[in-house]
Amino acid sequence: MRFAGCYVALATPFGRSGGIDEAALRRLVRSHLRAGTAGLVACGSTGEAATLTHEEYRRVLALTIAESRGLLPVIAGIGTSATAKTVEMAREAESLGADALLVLAPYYNKPTQDGLYQHFRAVSRNTRLPVIVYNIPGRTAVNILPRTLLRIAADCPNVAAVKEASGSLDQVSEIVAGAAQGFAVLSGDDSLTVPMMAVGAAGVVSVVANVAPKETAAMCAAALAGDFKKARRLHRALFPLVKALFVETNPIPVKAALEMMGLCGGAPRLPLTALTAANRGLLRRELAARGLL
């Protein structure tokens, strides 16, 4: 499986009762089927996976797979601070029909670089699915260094990509330079997609694509084609929206945006809170300026 282009990090809609809004989730998935989106990431950070019960996780993943109807690959977000539990999640996601796994680095317990290597090796050996390593030190408190990632990729044939959200172009450049042909680097920061693709990344796992899928996909397509003049133009056009969608902790703003657009409602689950009134005004103005309301 080749990873390239724009993958959307799907939000998880909640209804007024606080449960999963299944109809809204189906609408959200359908909005991507012909928008140029390369694939769907379910139950990741943007999908509030940390707040889902086990049954909710299964239901969100199963609904996403069913509604995509085989038209787009579905990547299941998995990952805990325990390797054995993460292996269980990998097996479960595979049994539900996921096409690939986005595996979060262990959080809270701050493993060493060798511990990270052993963790990802154990997960990859217990699934036949392609694995995307998810490096997001701002949330996990541990950075997967380039040498560690390259060691993982070299020793684990089904580790096919990394979602790199360290914010470091130096780190991305080291990975691109050292990785085998076919290994993909995907941006984990919407604001850095074009800069990362300029040094060899293959695409993005995008929050912004929830609300502007066609534009985000077009930006990635231009960069992949080597048309960085067009990619920069699209980046500049999207950048104010990107800033607005990260004015508070993700996914608070994107869930508010989806509600304003009528795609789905429901505030995030505690401990995240609804977008503040001042920031709702800022976000609404930005969406209106782009013709999204």
Located regions from the model:
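Active-site beta->alpha loop and helix N-cap motifs at the rims of alpha/beta catalytic domains
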Residues: 1-8, 12-141, 151
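C-terminal alpha-helical cap/extension of soluble enzyme domains
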Residues: 2, 7-13, 35-37, 198-201, ...
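Alpha-helix N-capping/helix-start residues
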Residues: 16, 22, 54, 146, ...
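Short, amphipathic alpha-helical "lid/cap" segments that border enzyme active or binding sites
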Residues: 22, 26-29, 146, 280, ...
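A general structural signal for well-ordered alpha-helical segments in protein cores
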Residues: 25, 57, 61, 86, ...
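Short helix-capping segments at alpha-helix termini
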Residues: 66-72, 96-97, 127-129, 154-158, ...
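Catalytic alpha/beta core domains of metabolic enzymes, predominantly
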Residues: 125, 139-246
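Glycine-rich phosphate-binding "P-loop"
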Residues: 135-136, 158, 269-270
